[in-house]
Regions:
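Conserved N-terminal catalytic/coupling substructures associated with nucleotide/phosphate chemistry
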Residues: 1-113
Length: 113
């Protein structure tokens, strides 16, 4: 699935964050260990998305993020830390840079730690 600014705007309209959708402001940076924990938790809840560069309080403005300038580096870092692949997409939204972590669901009968 190609993630577009329009898709981000649809997600922003959500009334609240869910087990499968997290918004994080992360204007300048985001703790990698915290990111790994979010990836594991979302995988265990059936998969979903983490968006960096979007305020988590409504109206969920795009604030942009400078976190993880090396997308390939964080992609491999996540795999090495948690043992499964997370797709990382950088979107140039008109209001700022947004990074989306698309977390797959864990295989049935297993749990990630």
């Amino acid at each position: 699935m190609k993630i577009t600014p329009a898709q981000i705007d649809l997600w922003r309209q959500s009334q609240s964050e869910t087990q499968n959708l997290e918004f994080k402001e992360a204007k300048n940076q985001f703790d990698t260990k915290r990111l790994f924990k979010y990836c594991v938790a979302i995988a265990n809840e059936g998969g979903g998305h983490i968006l960096l560069g979007v305020a988590d309080k409504t109206p969920r403005q795009i604030v942009g993020t400078q976190a993880f300038p090396n997308i390939m580096g964080i992609t491999s870092g996540i795999f090495n830390a948690v043992g499964f692949r997370v797709d990382v997409t950088e979107v140039a939204h008109p209001d700022g840079r947004v990074i989306i972590f698309s977390v797959p669901p864990r295989p049935l009968g297993t749990a990630h730690h």
